[in-house]
Amino acid sequence: IIAFMGLARLGFIIDFIPVPAITAFMVGSAISICSGQVKGLLGQTGNIDTSAPSYRIIIDTLKDLPTAQGYDAAMGLIALAALYALRSGFNYGAEKKPSFAKIFFFLGALRTVFIIALFALISLGINQHRRDNPAFALVGNVPKGFDQAGVPVLKADVIKLIVSQLPACVICLLIEHIAVAKTFGRVNNYTIDPSQELIAIGITNLLGPFLGAFPATGAFSRSAIQSKSGARSPFTGIITAIVVLIAMYTLTSGLYYIPKATLSAVIIHAVGDLIVPPNTIYQFWLIAPLDAVI
């Protein structure tokens, strides 16, 4: 669908999506993702349907708080607190020492990797001799390489499941990718062609399933890091891909002991910034009351 829109030069449609609508969509997505990760963060064993509407997930999560596991919650909540503490510390350092601002930025960008590695080592020390009965939930075995490579097969029952979610998926992909492209185009003083962007992301998602890939779209965090690094062309994506390939074939065994609660903390931390403060809505109201209502 996305590739067709790009080939049909329908990218101009994106320009008609108002900023408040994009903001509201991103906030809603962030709330949905965060609410679905609380179960893993606390190690809850209750029957919580994380694919249900956000309000239902929040209600079920609160009801099932007694099922939270202490060790899982500790690994998740401490990791989440550490991520925010590191970010605040590096931001404070950048403000106090502007000459080292870029160094603090890169240290802040690496905080997620540091926390995952730290808690994986802690988990290794605790669970090394009790793999069959770990103290808390672990990621477990991660297959090496492209074990799912092949011609994808879409069955009728799978199509029925995704049809109802397809419009939301397309809108989410469009908004996120174009938002990333426009943001960094504005920062680095270049103009993007929305139709060209749609063709690129559409073809990527057409070829991805042959290697067992998840649907792809623009990434705020990685784009920010590349922009700060001085990247000026898509060639940086090739460098990233090579590093990921090496990791897929050599480092997967090291992922076994990563606590699931820590991964939930990382996800919540990553998407939490998409939830805008209340004064943003007030600013929309000052500019255009109708847009704020929308």
Predicted features, each with a name:
Residues 1-294:
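Transmembrane helical cores of multi-pass ion-transport proteins
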